[in-house]
Design a protein with these regions (language model features):
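Extended recognition/assembly regions associated with phosphoester-bond processing machinery
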Residues: 1-451
Length: 451
């Protein structure tokens, strides 16, 4: 998508001084996540695993000489008892409590389990490494089953034991990808607003909260200083789960006309919130709509009417008849990647992180974010436990360039951390809370990310 610079209506403050909203250069990088020429012909998921292993193995092979140059690199089939070597492959975690689809089919659909565990970890879980030649069970304490998940590609230093397992002595991960050098910090600051989990149409949704947020962004609340800050907001990203449709309407039954209209009500309400005209004594201009005031990206989430499997494709623009008339409105993919003034943003609506919390453990959600960067993969558990499209010749979730901002939406609370890589990479990690529950949106300074 070509770069975009837009003119926006000026804002006025109490002193009648006009404030012009700042502008930024936008570049969409979602092409990798778009399913355009892909055709489903009944292919299996093995091909996406082969593509992932091929790409990651090439990368890890290039890192081995600086890690353990004195050791030979072997395949699983070439392992010899007691001989130290390095093997590269895809991890598979054998989990005692992992739900089995065959068990689900064997139960009656109407019977729900009494307990739905939020985490399927068990002390008897163990890891297996697999390549094209075979698989081997892993032992030792260097590779904790509680940290790793199925789908991660690693290099392991160790040796085969008499029991036929591979005793791991050291682990090499891909590490943070290279990062494009950021432009020098500018004195002219700009801000990006992230909000997720609006859940319009749910019982927990409060339109008044969102209205207050819109008023802040458009410069209709606060004193001169706050309105001056609003003029520095150059972009808004809605990170998934914008609406929530009653499950009673999604049971696969034919709907009467009344229920059919109820399906679209949440989107009608959201579109109105994004396009309504604000009345203000500060200005005579009637164009103060958030969709017209600044560029707006909207990503699909797990509760939105989009395809279930990742990467989720953009929400159909016909759902937003009012917002879609503005060239500042963009319906984007999930995951979503873009650049603002050469600052790279990468993020998801939260499904990848939610799945990691079910099959591994960490002290906080930011640790999960950091791991995906070090593994260079946005969704390592896909397609094992997280639905994704069966790509045949590529894995779109591989991270080949380190973002400056890495965000994930629909989390329980706001968290942030600055991650520093071994080669000088600096990444601002952000967990964006559900707005319907917390009333919190996240404002990110584009040129002062380390702050």
């Amino acid at each position: 998508m070509p770069s975009l610079q837009s003119k926006f209506p000026a804002m006025e403050v109490d002193s009648q001084e006009q404030l012009q909203r700042k502008q930024s250069t936008y570049l969409s990088l979602d092409e990798n996540f778009e399913i355009q020429k892909e055709v489903y012909r009944g292919q299996q998921y093995s091909q996406i695993y082969f593509a992932r292993l091929h790409m990651m193995r090439t990368l890890l092979y290039s890192l081995v000489p600086n890690w353990k140059s004195h050791l030979p690199v072997c395949t699983v089939l070439e392992l010899e008892e007691g001989k130290e070597c390095i093997i590269v492959g895809t991890l598979y975690k054998h989990m005692k409590l992992k739900p089995c689809i065959l068990d689900e089919y064997s139960k009656e659909r109407s019977v729900a389990p009494l307990i739905k565990p939020h985490n399927f970890m068990h002390q008897d879980d163990y890891l297996v490494l697999e390549d094209e030649s075979g698989r081997v069970k892993l032992g030792g304490t260097k590779l904790s089953p509680s940290v790793y998940v199925t789908g991660v590609v690693v290099a392991l230093h160790g040796k085969e034991t008499s029991a036929g397992a591979f005793f791991v002595e050291d682990v090499l991960e891909a590490g943070l990808p290279p990062q494009i050098e950021r432009p020098l910090e500018s004195r002219e600051d700009k801000y990006v607003v992230f909000v997720s989990g609006l859940s319009i149409g749910s019982s927990s949704s409060n339109p008044l909260q969102f209205q207050l947020l819109v008023d802040h962004i458009t410069g209709h609340l606060g004193d001169e200083e706050e309105q001056g800050l609003a003029a520095e907001i150059v972009h808004l990203v809605i990170v998934g789960n914008s609406v929530e449709i009653s499950r009673g309407l999604l049971n696969g039954q034919n709907l009467v006309s009344k229920d059919q209209s109820r399906l679209s009500e949440p989107f009608k309400e959201l579109d109105i919130l994004l396009t309504q005209v604000f009345s203000s004594h500060h200005c005579d201009d009637q164009h103060f709509k958030i969709a017209a005031s600044l560029p707006l990206d909207i990503m699909p989430g797990s509760s939105d009417p989009a395809n279930f499997a990742l990467p989720q494709q953009p929400l159909n623009r016909c759902l937003f008849p009012g917002s879609a008339t503005y060239n500042t409105f963009r319906s984007c993919t999930n995951p979503h990647c873009f650049e603002l003034d050469s600052i790279r943003f990468l993020g998801t609506s939260g499904q990848n992180l939610d799945d990691l919390t079910k099959y591994s453990e960490a002290k906080d959600k930011l640790d999960f974010l950091e791991r995906t960067l070090r593994w260079r993969h946005l969704a390592p558990t896909a397609p094992n436990t997280l639905g994704c499209y069966p790509f045949t010749d590529r894995d779109p979730f591989l991270i080949d360039s380190c973002p400056d901002v890495y965000f994930v939406g629909n989390q329980e609370k706001y968290e942030t951390r600055l991650l520093k890589g071994l080669e000088g990479q600096l990444v601002r990690l952000i967990c964006i809370p559900r707005f319907c529950e917390t009333g919190v949106a996240v404002v990110v300074s584009v040129f002062h990310l380390p702050g």
